[in-house]
Amino acid sequence: MTYRLKKEISKIFILFKEEFNMAENKYAGTQTEKNLQEAFAGESQARNKYTYFASVAKKEGYEQMAAIFLKTADNEKEHAKMWFKELAGIGDTKANLAAAAEGENFEWTDMYEDFAKTAEEEGFPALAAKFRMVGAIEKQHEERYRALLKNIETAQVFEKSEVKVWECRNCGHIVVGTKAPSVCPVCSHPQSYFEVREENY
């Protein structure tokens, strides 16, 4: 993790702790905080690498090795979560959506654009274009997180101002109305299992 990226992550942590009353990072400003950030980054990267390695092993016919890579990736995920919790990086859903939106904003407004400029200067125009294309995706991610956050802030997650088609994510039951039922009448799962149905096929 680069110094600049670490600095940006620290700023985001501070901003959201203040805004959403998240737990305080008792390690702030210490070498231990830097070590925790490095540990989180290292475990997160290892987890991703091992899932990629598992895909290769599976394609090559090594099912046991693929399973071991995936099992180890799950272990690394838990290690990363442990260090991220120590950094007080996990809040409630509202705080997490806001933090995610800020992270995506940094990626598309600063990080990928800076990476693209450097790639161009060093003679890698195709990579520069790819950095910018991924940056455009990160912009969409930010917009999605901000829309979801707005739904929570305006109490529009399970109730809309217009009639919608709601679908139970568990059993597929359909309800038409402005509000999802508090309990699915078919499978008895709670309202949290309902979403606005999207047909994109």
What is each of the regions a protein language model found here?
Residues 22-201:
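Non-heme di-metal
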